Amino acid sequence: MTNFEEMQILESMEILVDTREQSTPKAIQRYNSFGVPYSKTTLAYGDYTANFVLLDGSRLYDISKTVNPLCIVERKMNLDELAQCFTHSRERFEREFQRAIAHNAFIHLICEDGSFEKIEGHKYNSKYPPKAFLASITAWQRRYNIHFHFCSSLETGHLIKEFLYRDMKERIEGGEFDG
């Protein structure tokens, strides 16, 4: 594939937002910060993925059906929500990542306004002990090959786009879409 063809695919990027993501004013602000078009569709797992127009004119995903993405971003608004997922919603959360792994998906998990320092200092509103919280993060990183990222909520939209763009660029350069 030529550099021109690679750029043609990458410039067609559209972020797909799972229909379960609420369209709050803050969410709309995040979507607008992608810097590329976005649309809502049903994702089998994850909150965000990206669609691209391939060289033959087809789209990577048919959004009229449930999408099983190659790369996803799961977003948590803070450590409280992440702690909830590891405790009260653990089975549902685990099933989602099992579905992703069954489709060989690459998984990014963004936790806004969190940090390992905040976890270790128990600076979140949950009785979930810091040691157990850290153990869950490290175990799930290994078990589901999840890449955890902590960031400011102001960075989230840009990071979602960047993670998905770079994943596709690596796939193209690795020959995944060569005819």
Name what the model sees in each region:
Residues 1-68, 80-179:
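Non-catalytic C-terminal interaction segments of nucleic acid-processing enzymes
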Residues 71-77:
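Conserved catalytic cores of phosphodiester-cleaving nucleases, focusing on short active-site segments
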